[in-house]
A protein has these predicted regions:
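A short glycine-rich, hydrophobically flanked beta-strand micro-motif that places a catalytic Asp/Glu
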Residues: 54, 239, 243, 250-251, ...
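ATP-dependent carboxylate activation and anion-phosphoryl transfer catalytic cores
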Residues: 2-20, 25-28, 48, 302-388
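Phosphate-binding site of ATP-dependent enzymes
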Residues: 220-313, 339-341
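Short acidic-glycine loop/turn motifs at beta-strand connectors
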Residues: 59-62, 100, 256-261, 335-338
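Active-site nucleotide/adenylate-binding loops and adjacent lid/helix of ATP-dependent enzymes
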Residues: 2-24, 29-30, 36-40, 53, ...
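Conserved N-proximal alpha/beta basic substrate-recognition cap immediately N-terminal to
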Residues: 18, 32-40, 48, 54-181
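A glycine- and small-aliphatic-rich helix-loop capping segment at beta-alpha/alpha-beta transitions
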Residues: 137-146, 221-226, 363-364
Length: 388
């Protein structure tokens, strides 16, 4: 592991002419390294003339530490060990909420360090303990403005089964599936396997509450299904078994509208994979983040005008059905018959240089830096009332 230790970076005095943004990344989930890579992209892109940045890392143990403002040290690379934030044995950092806003206290080499007023928190946490409504709930309790979806949408977007329930209620198609509950597999595995007989092969077995394609397996034969369920259960005890959908993988970036305006939708993009260059059979972790030469981001997607309109309209409907705010990426399968089937909703999509979300907005006319600024400004004007 490449450890990024908190060694006491200097903290600038608050600049009253700038908005103070705490960029929070790392975290306790298995996507810790991906979160650091996302932070690297955002720290490189954020407008330093408008925003004063406090880079705050969360260790895998849950400690909050101030780290050096060095995006290169956070980047994901297949030529070095994964990045991990450490606190070198220090205690817990805290975010407090005095009257009038949030005040951040993190760990220093000699004890707690008060960083002062924070205007906005930009949580770049992927997976559990970050993207699932946990940090959002903490910030809501303290009335601290933050970027992205609220508690409910974050929690629903994290749980693929709950997402399907909400989308189904809105009349939006998803893949046929069977839920393997946390205790059901241990209690009666044969009942689960029998239920899965109604699904069409190949099957995709995935953790219900994880991202970055962690723990996902493609299953071609019934005899391989139990092992695939165990692989997914190692990431999350709640598992989803889905029928494979034959279709092109199309992704859509959605951005909250200003005021009461409708959600804004970027040009759809798609993933083109070259297995001869190291891509897997599907868009797994290695293909997504390490096999850069094997993956091409195509935007606009190579689809017709009717399909484009359908995909964009469905993405906006899905965004609102789940109650998203700020941003989300809606992933589709576009079948040969022209049906748009939602695969998942990602409420904190990756912002790495290899991520499709910022690229789709760039193609649509909103550059990386302006996109980050827009997200921060949306958070600043959003009510901190939990019933907004």
């Amino acid at each position: 592991m490449t450890d990024l230790q908190e060694t006491g970076p200097s903290v600038p005095s608050p600049d009253k002419s700038k908005v103070r943004v705490a960029v929070v990344f790392g975290g306790r989930s298995g996507e810790h390294t991906i979160s650091c890579a996302t932070a690297a992209g955002v720290l490189s892109a954020i407008d330093r003339d408008r925003y004063e940045v406090l880079p705050v890392g969360i260790t895998p143990e849950g400690q909050w530490v101030l780290v050096e403002d060095d995006p290169a040290a956070l980047e994901l690379s297949d030529s070095r060990p994964p990045v991990t934030i450490t606190a070198d044995g220090l205690g817990q950092g805290v975010l407090t909420a005095p009257l009038g806003g949030g005040e951040l206290t993190v760990l220093g080499p000699t004890g707690p360090r008060v960083l002062g007023q924070v205007d906005v928190v930009l949580p770049l946490l992927h997976g559990p303990y970050g993207e699932d409504g946990t940090i959002q709930g903490m910030l809501e309790m303290m009335s601290v403005p933050y970027v992205g979806c609220g508690v409910l949408a974050s929690a629903a977007g994290m749980d693929k089964q709950v997402t399907k329930v909400l989308l189904g209620a809105a009349g939006i198609a998803t893949a046929p599936h069977v839920v393997v509950g946390p205790h059901a597999w241990k209690r009666d595995p044969e009942a689960i396997l029998t239920a899965c007989q109604s699904l069409s092969y190949p099957l995709f077995v995935k953790p219900s509450r994880a991202g970055s394609s962690l723990g996902i397996s493609k299953v071609e034969r019934p005899e391989d299904l139990p092992d695939a369920i165990e692989v997914a259960r190692a990431v999350d005890p709640k598992v989803l078994v889905e029928s494979g959908i034959v279709g092109r993988e199309v992704e859509v970036a959605v951005l909250q509208g200003r005021g009461d305006d409708a959600p804004r939708v970027a040009e759809p993009g798609e993933i083109a994979m070259d297995t001869s260059q190291g891509a897997g059979e599907f868009y797994d972790f290695e293909t997504k983040y390490l096999a850069h030469d094997a993956v091409a981001m195509v935007c606009p997607a190579r689809i017709g005008p009717e399909e484009r309109a359908l995909i964009m309209d469905t993405a906006a409907r899905a965004f609102e059905a789940v109650g998203c705010e700020g941003l989300a990426r809606v992933d589709f399968f576009l079948t040969e018959t022209g049906e748009a089937v939602v695969n998942e909703i990602n409420t904190m999509p990756g912002f790495t240089p290899f991520s499709l979300y910022p690229y789709m907005w760039q193609v649509s006319g909103l550059g990386y830096t302006d996109l980050v600024s827009e997200l921060i400004e949306l958070a600043r004007v959003r009510s901190t009332d939990v019933n907004r």
